Swiss-Prot record:
SUPFAM superfamilies: Class II aaRS and biotin synthetases, tRNA-binding arm. It comes from Klebsiella pneumoniae subsp. pneumoniae (strain ATCC 700721 / MGH 78578). It is found in: Cytoplasm. Keywords: Aminoacyl-tRNA synthetase, ATP-binding, Cytoplasm, Ligase, Nucleotide-binding, Protein biosynthesis. GO terms for molecular function: ATP binding; serine-tRNA ligase activity. It holds the Pfam family tRNA-synt_2b. Pathway: Aminoacyl-tRNA biosynthesis; selenocysteinyl-tRNA(Sec) biosynthesis; L-seryl-tRNA(Sec) from L-serine and tRNA(Sec): step 1/1. This is Serine--tRNA ligase. Transmembrane segments: none annotated. PANTHER family: SERINE--TRNA LIGASE, SERYL-TRNA SYNTHETASE. One of its GO terms (biological process) is seryl-tRNA aminoacylation.
Amino acid sequence: MLDPNLLRTEPDAVAEKLARRGFKLDVDKLRALEERRKVLQVQTENLQAERNSRSKSIGQAKARGEDIEPLRLEVNKLGEQLDAAKSELETLLAEIRDIALAIPNIPHDDVPVGRDENDNVEVSRWGTPRQFDFEVRDHVTLGEMHGGLDFAAAVKLTGSRFVVMKGQLARLHRALAQFMLDLHTEQHGYSENYVPYLVNQDTLYGTGQLPKFAGDLFHTRPLEEEADSSNYALIPTAEVPLTNLVRDEIIDEDDLPIKMTAHTPCFRSEAGSYGRDTRGLIRMHQFDKVEMVQIVRPEDSMAALEEMTGHAEKVLQLLGLPYRKVALCTGDMGFSACKTYDLEVWVPAQNTYREISSCSNVWDFQARRMQARCRSKSDKKTRLVHTLNGSGLAVGRTLVALMENYQQADGRIEIPEVLRPYMRGLEYIG
């Protein structure tokens, strides 16, 4: 959520920056609402003061033995006017808040300007894609060869965009997640967390999934039903519960940064993705991911983004998977992000790079929604923290890349050395 004061005092400047990401801010409407808010605010305060004054006069008139009925009627009328003004003001403030909640974050000044993924800027590459001397099989074919990926069984159990993993491929999938967690906790300084997979609406508002992206979530009950303690949604990413751990908290600056990680399933409806990536593990309704979250001082967030992206890169480097680092343009960034790097891993069967990690600096956008603040040791003043999140990595897509990049001519899959301790020394699947 953007700073309301900024929207009130510099709407044109905000609109200009948001236009770079393809968002049109209705400045005229905002101004009109703000002017009406000021009028109602003054009207409410004046009515309250007048009512208080008249109420005091009733006591004085009564003490003098005067007829207080006219004053009482006047106070009642003022009370009705005050209630009406308060009601209108509350409705207006709710409308302003709804508009504010639908406004995306302002892109950082060094984010490349563009409309979509075609305007993203490649920053660097690591590794050289392998040249195969045999016909490359995709991960679906390899999975079927080894009996490890059963999409038909998942359709029977649930539906499309799900999978049943079996045997050594299921073990390899688990090994990948364990390897990522061990790397981030033992070498990168993150604390491991186990979090709920169901969260309430306040939590989803905090990180920006609600109200704009309600259709992307799996809800336990229809959203239009009255919210209560049982109105949950499945998490689309561990970013949601991890980041909300600091909601309504004031953190001593000396305790920052806070670096957290978690391995969870993620659940997404993939609304708007009909017909895209229908084969295999690339786009699923349920997939596993190891997430990284950092809570930092505002002045440290840009450096933290570079660090976090490097942590995700380290996973790919240790696995020996070629990838490229891409700076997302303004039109391709997520709703809450002010700057984002994507890591795209080489997928041989598709002869292209595919996203496997997205690392974002969210600035104070989520912190303002969550009222997550830090306190200075010197002057005891509080300010909003900055939050960052990144995939470290998407486990299913890492499995895809590993299977295809490490496949052998006979269909066997070589296991990278760093994973063999998690596979009881196994060198090949198949």
